[in-house]
Amino acid sequence: MNKIFAAFKPKGLSSNAFLSTLKKKYKNKKAGYSGTLDPFAKGVLIVAFGQYTKLFRFLKKTPKTYKATLWLGVYSLSLDDQNIKEIQNIKEFDLANLKQIIDQMQGIISYTPPQFSAKRINGTRAYELAKKGIEANLKPCQMEVFDCKILSYNHPFLNIEITVSEGAYIRSYCELFARKLGINATLSSLERIKEGKFVYNNEKSLNVLKYINLKPNFIKDLNKLENGAKIFVEELEFHDEGDYYIETEKYFSIINIKENTVKYLLNKVEKC
């Protein structure tokens, strides 16, 4: 069974553990996901079955949008509602001041990923090492904040909606935001509501061709795709270098054009 959809991962499960529940639910062992959410976070997780597990690298998965609740005045080793070491009663902030900092933190931001993150270190998630008391050597990164707005402020809880680039960590954004206020802060909740064009819709099966970040190409002799025969650039409508998809009534293939040579990246993937 080929299928791709947006699932809703609950809080408290790793993305791998959640995928295992979906494998059992749909009775399909060949499954995968893209865009890991660590156990603290909940929300949209792109899941695929069958041949569609090979399509993740072609999907348009940015920007990503999250809803987050910042708990002001709280110090947590994991920057979430666990491992809390200190809770301070701090004075309520002026909303205009908070909005000013939000506006300042737009565009490219440099940061170091948090120890409790889904970042892989030699094949192991950073949060798994952190739980064992092992501090990972995480390199500085950059993320882009496309938009951020305050949804509500009920001191000490600040609710925001933030849209960011792939690879961004909202925990790190929270930490940087708190530094500008001169306080500690942690996340009390985190939900991914959108990943690219993917939104949760009761695990409805999606037309993958509407979600891949590729242009269509065309060939008159569709039998070549059916048979996996060699394709020459001259037979295609578009000759520019790059990746494309070509579809028939029942299947589609993904090809690459480079130096006037056509190569199959995936061939005869059955439509769902």
From Swiss-Prot:
Keyword Isomerase: yes
Catalytic activity: uridine(55) in tRNA = pseudouridine(55) in tRNA
Keyword Oxidoreductase: no
Coiled coil feature spans: none
Top-level taxon in the UniProt lineage: Bacteria
Entry EC no(s): 5.4.99.25
Matches recorded under Gene3D superfamilies: Pseudouridine synthase
Gene Ontology biological process terms, A to Z: mRNA pseudouridine synthesis; tRNA pseudouridine synthesis
InterPro entries reported for this sequence: PsdUridine_synth_cat_dom_sf, PsdUridine_synth_N, tRNA_psdUridine_synth_TruB
One Pfam family matching this protein: TruB_N
Keywords: Isomerase, tRNA processing
GO molecular function: RNA binding; tRNA pseudouridine(55) synthase activity
EC supergroup of this enzyme: isomerase
Entry annotation: catalytic residues: D38 (nucleophile)
Family statement: Belongs to the pseudouridine synthase TruB family. Type 1 subfamily.
Described function: Responsible for synthesis of pseudouridine from uracil-55 in the psi GC loop of transfer RNAs.
NCBIfam families linked to this entry: TruB
The protein's name: tRNA pseudouridine synthase B
UniProt source species: Campylobacter jejuni (strain RM1221)
